Amino acid sequence: MSPKKAKKRAEGANSNVFSMFEQTQIQEFKEAFTIMDQNRDGFIDKNDLRDTFAALGRVNVKNEEIDEMIKEAPGPINFTVFLTMFGEKLKGADPEETILNAFKVFDPEGKGVLKADYVREMLTTQAERFSKDEIDQMFAAFPPDVTGNLDYKNLVHIITHGEEK
């Protein structure tokens, strides 16, 4: 295949991934990519992943775990590759699983709960920021337990099914 045809094919493949998502979703993925691209070089590499984990409080991530994540990509992880990888993972995923996976990023031990203060901080400082009123409404509807933890698994179930487990 000529270089021009190969380039054209790659461009075509890339444009398909953008048609899988609504513009607002693409913007949200872009914000997530920007947060993970710690060194702002336009690519997510091992150091970016390690720094992202550290920012989430997970400092002892094994090199093998990071290597496995990087190997999932067909090459350097720019935004288009990042979007493609998420597109493949989200194809056919149900909304409950998708929302749960978003919370699990912040719960590396898989406890099913997050500190309410941490959730409040993340929702008011990252991506599409919640207003104080929106946060207050959420915590009024889904109050943390006596230890200050938010049971996000139950929260996601209520969001997606409209009822408590």
Swiss-Prot record:
CDD domains registered for this protein in UniProt: EFh
GO terms of molecular function: calcium ion binding; structural constituent of muscle
Sequence positions bearing N,N,N-trimethylserine: 2
Modified residues (Phosphoserine): 15, 19
Pfam families, A to Z: EF-hand_7 (PF13499)
EF-hand domain mapped to chain residues: 24-59, 94-129, 130-165
Modification after translation, per record: N-terminus is methylated by METTL11A/NTM1.
Residues carrying Phosphothreonine: 52
Gene Ontology biological process terms from the UniProt entry: heart contraction; heart development; positive regulation of the force of heart contraction; regulation of the force of heart contraction
GO CC terms, sorted: A band; myosin complex
Post-translational modification Deamidated asparagine, affected residues: 14
InterPro entries per UniProt: EF-hand-dom_pair, EF_Hand_1_Ca_BS, EF_hand_dom, Myosin_RLC
Note in the entry: This chain binds calcium.
Task of the protein: Contractile protein that plays a role in heart development and function. Following phosphorylation, plays a role in cross-bridge cycling kinetics and cardiac muscle contraction by increasing myosin lever arm stiffness and promoting myosin head diffusion; as a consequence of the increase in maximum contraction force and calcium sensitivity of contraction force.
Complex formation: Myosin is a hexamer of 2 heavy chains and 4 light chains. Interacts with MYOC.
Name listed for the protein in its UniProt record: Myosin regulatory light chain 2, ventricular/cardiac muscle isoform
Organism: Oryctolagus cuniculus (Rabbit)
